[in-house]
């Protein structure tokens, strides 16, 4: 299975368009979104071309490919405009490895929910990384729209971070 992992769109119509381009270029089986889809949050600047309804329209057009976890900026009202399900987390096996996908505000490299996985991928911190710790692999795709700490706009494909 080929998957693309994207996090922290924060309502950017501009970067939602980039997701369409990524889908066309990579042609993944699944696009895994790690939360914070529409709202920018009180601590973030407005994202480029802040248009949450445009983001919803684009994501809804990709609904058959989407697996989505709920972020700390996602609310019940966001689910009303979405034609896909928001999950607290996603567990799946890919190529014999157990993956745990979450937003990252509750569970992350510093706060592991349990140990029945091989790889944990989470968003929230807006900085991409891949790191091994205590026999587990932890990865973060960074933020597609609002990278922090001088990091680049990024996502994960084939479980490698792609900067653009």
What are these regions (language model features)?
Residues 2-94:
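Core catalytic region of metal-dependent phosphoesterases/phosphodiesterases
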Residues 98-100, 105-164:
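Conserved beta-sheet core of the metallophosphoesterase superfamily
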């Amino acid at each position: 299975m080929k998957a693309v992992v994207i996090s922290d769109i924060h309502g950017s119509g501009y970067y939602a368009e980039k997701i369409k381009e990524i889908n066309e270029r990579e042609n993944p089986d699944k696009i895994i979104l790690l939360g914070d889809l529409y709202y920018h949050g009180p601590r973030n600047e407005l994202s480029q071309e802040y248009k949450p309804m445009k983001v919803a329209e684009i994501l809804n057009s990709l609904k058959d490919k989407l697996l989505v976890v709920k972020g700390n900026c996602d609310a019940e009202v966001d689910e009303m405009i979405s034609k896909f399900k928001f999950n607290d987390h996603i567990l799946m096996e890919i190529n014999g490895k157990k993956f745990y996908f979450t937003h990252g505000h509750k569970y992350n490299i510093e706060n592991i929910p349990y140990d029945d996985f091989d790889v944990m991928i989470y968003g929230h911190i807006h900085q991409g990384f891949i790191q091994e710790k205590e026999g587990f692999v932890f990865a973060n795709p960074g933020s597609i729209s609002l990278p922090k700490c001088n990091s680049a706009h990024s996502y994960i494909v084939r479980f490698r971070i792609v900067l653009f």
